Amino acid sequence: YKRQLRRFYGDGCPAAGIVEELYRLGYEAFTKPVPKMAGLDELLAWLDAHHIPMAVASSSPMTIIEGHLDHWQLGHYFKAVISGEHLARSKPAPDIFLLAAEKLGTAPAETLVLEDSYNGVRAGAAGGFVTVMVPDMAPANDEMRRLYTAECRDLYEVLEGLQKGRF
């Protein structure tokens, strides 16, 4: 980056400082706790009360995942926390979900994957998981509708679906 900045803006450009500030801002934005999705507390409590094992399987670095779990005090719910940072293949490959199912002792066809991303839905479907899309930033499209088991508008609807045995 420094070379490119100097090439475009000349030798007087404080490239090192600019790059350092960009990294700092990016890290700050990435590590800032994300807001909890509506219905998360209720869903986790219900799953826990019914002794359903849970895992976090995220492409984010482990330090970020653990930071969010610690911030919201949710770590105790999860039997496994898996980061894709050390896996050979990331989503849309199903590797992270297959590893999570292995750690939970569940078969993919009996394991629910909740996803808000296209690559996550692709990974869940590729691994043979019960894949429920809960769109956040990107709405479901035709490809997602062909791949997922169900779509829920929020985690309250996921909880209702579980309670009624829909998936």
Regions found by a protein language model. Give the residues of each.
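Conserved small/polar residues in nucleotide/adenosyl-binding loops
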Residues: 1
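Metal-dependent phosphoesterase signature
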Residues: 4-41, 45, 50
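Short, flexible segments with low predicted structural confidence
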Residues: 18-19, 40, 53, 72, ...
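A generic structural signal for short
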Residues: 31-32, 53-54, 85, 109
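Asp-based, Mg2+/Mn2+-dependent phosphohydrolase catalytic module
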Residues: 45-48, 62-167
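Hydrophobic beta-strand core positions in alpha/beta domains
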Residues: 55-56, 133
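Conserved phosphate-coupling serine/threonine residues in phosphotransfer and NTP-handling enzymes
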Residues: 58-60
